[in-house]
């Protein structure tokens, strides 16, 4: 009885009816009339998506949203309330968690609602707002990661000769990140490109299908300043970070050989080891960001350069990978951050990972020790 009722639902009967599984319907048929002016003619050639895809997408986005909000919320809480973690460098970590938190807090529920109705039902204004939030917090995340990479470059490559980051300079960088992000993401509201429904009709994003150069130029310039430039800066920073780490390890091996000892670990060497651990954590986070957002960039470039036909199902994966990125960061820090794990165990014993024996060699505390020491020296001078 239940199965008969399910099969008789309009979405299922529409999907299975007619030639090829569709009764002359398109993916646009369920779109409310007030939204049609935003829908590109490209999408009218595609039949409705299988309702199971909408159900699967809604479920996955819901799960990712819960994990991201809880995970990033805990990162913000623990880094903000644990004294040993309240350092200038970790202000950037908190800002990254804040951006990821807001990404899923503002986007998972609307997408879940639209997946239930199998189309965008929240109106044109919410479509623009949804797309703006996705662009804003995505931009905020990558530029925060860029600032983290530059901070690691400053500490690891330049070492004690570098000017330490203070709370003031960290806050100025965070202010720049958000001012820069807002400036780029409000442009489509003023006519440089626009925010429109994606092909699956349950999410909204930039218009990469309109063929005029006003729209195309925004995608190209935005991609440079919000993707390629920060990515290039990150690669540049980590290239020299890895060079410095390699040179340090080579120096340590030669010193051990000369002194004929199995192990040589001075306080400075332990400090550098902690710096290297943080560099690996940050590099892992950035790699996950790269794999999360690159599919969406490829979809945008495919649209403006017409290299292949973009299907509604393809746009689902672009949206999904981009939003999943907001889940990665708290997991990475939870696994690889001893001091974070120690604070997590203290504040949330039932949720904590098993504490490791090297909690005193925290990646975060090690990462900022050099900066703190330089601050003290400059103050005493």
UniProtKB/Swiss-Prot annotation:
Stretches in topological domain Cytoplasmic: 79-90, 151-169, 246-280, 337-381
Bilayer disposition of the protein: Multi-pass membrane protein
Extracellular side stretches: 1-53, 116-130, 194-217, 305-311
Modification type N6-(retinylidene)lysine: residues: 323
Subcellular location: Cell projection, Rhabdomere membrane
Pfam families assigned: 7tm_1 (PF00001)
Key words, A-Z: Cell membrane, Cell projection, Chromophore, Disulfide bond, G-protein coupled receptor, Glycoprotein, Membrane, Phosphoprotein, Photoreceptor protein, Receptor, Retinal protein, Sensory transduction, Transducer, Transmembrane, Transmembrane helix, Vision
PTM summary: Phosphorylated on some or all of the serine and threonine residues present in the C-terminal region.
Transmembrane segments: 54-78, 91-115, 131-150, 170-193, 218-245, 281-304, 312-336
Entry keyword Nucleus: no
GO molecular function: G protein-coupled receptor activity; photoreceptor activity
Compositionally biased intervals (Polar residues): 354-370
Segments for region (Disordered): 354-381
InterPro entries xrefs: GPCR_opsins (IPR050125), GPCR_Rhodpsn (IPR000276), GPCR_Rhodpsn_7TM (IPR017452), Opsin (IPR001760), Opsin_lateye (IPR001391), Retinal_BS (IPR027430)
Protein name: Opsin-1
UniProt lineage: Eukaryota, Metazoa, Ecdysozoa, Arthropoda, Hexapoda
Gene behind the chain: Lo1
């Amino acid at each position: 009885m239940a199965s008969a009722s399910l099969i008789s639902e309009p979405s299922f009967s529409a999907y299975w009816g007619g030639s090829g599984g569709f009764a002359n319907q398109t993916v646009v048929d369920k779109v409310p009339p007030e939204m049609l002016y935003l829908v590109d003619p490209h999408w009218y050639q595609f039949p409705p998506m299988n309702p199971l895809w909408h159900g699967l997408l809604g479920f996955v986005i819901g799960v990712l949203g819960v994990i991201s909000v809880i995970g990033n919320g805990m990162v913000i809480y623990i880094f903000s309330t644990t004294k040993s973690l309240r350092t200038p460098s970790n202000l950037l970590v908190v800002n990254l968690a804040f951006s990821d938190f807001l990404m899923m807090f503002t986007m998972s529920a609307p997408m879940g609602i639209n997946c239930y109705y199998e189309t965008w039902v929240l109106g044109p204004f919410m479509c623009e707002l949804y797309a703006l939030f996705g662009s804003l917090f995505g931009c905020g995340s990558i530029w925060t990661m860029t600032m983290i990479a530059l901070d690691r470059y400053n500490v690891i490559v330049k070492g004690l000769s570098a000017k330490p980051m203070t709370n003031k300079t960290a806050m100025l960088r965070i202010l720049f990140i958000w001012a820069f992000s807002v400036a780029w993401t409000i442009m489509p509201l003023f006519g440089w490109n626009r925010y429109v429904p994606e092909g699956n009709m349950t999410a909204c994003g930039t218009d990469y299908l309109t063929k005029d150069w006003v729209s195309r130029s925004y995608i190209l310039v935005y991609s440079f300043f919000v993707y390629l430039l920060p990515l290039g800066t990150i690669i540049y920073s980590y290239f020299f970070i890895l060079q410095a780490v390699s040179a340090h390890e080579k120096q340590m091996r030669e010193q051990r050989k000369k002194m004929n000892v199995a192990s040589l670990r001075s306080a400075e060497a332990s400090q550098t080891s902690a710096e290297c651990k943080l560099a690996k954590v940050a590099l892992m986070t950035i790699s996950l960001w790269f794999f999360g957002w690159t599919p969406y960039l490829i979809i945008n470039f495919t649209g403006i350069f017409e290299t292949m036909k973009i299907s509604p199902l393809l746009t689902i994966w672009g949206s999904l990978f981009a939003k999943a990125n907001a889940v990665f960061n708290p997991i990475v820090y939870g696994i690889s951050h001893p001091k974070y794990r120690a604070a997590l165990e203290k504040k949330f014993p039932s949720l904590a990972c098993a504490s490791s024996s090297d909690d005193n060699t925290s990646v975060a505390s090690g990462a900022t020790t050099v900066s703190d020491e330089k601050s003290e020296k400059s103050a005493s001078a």
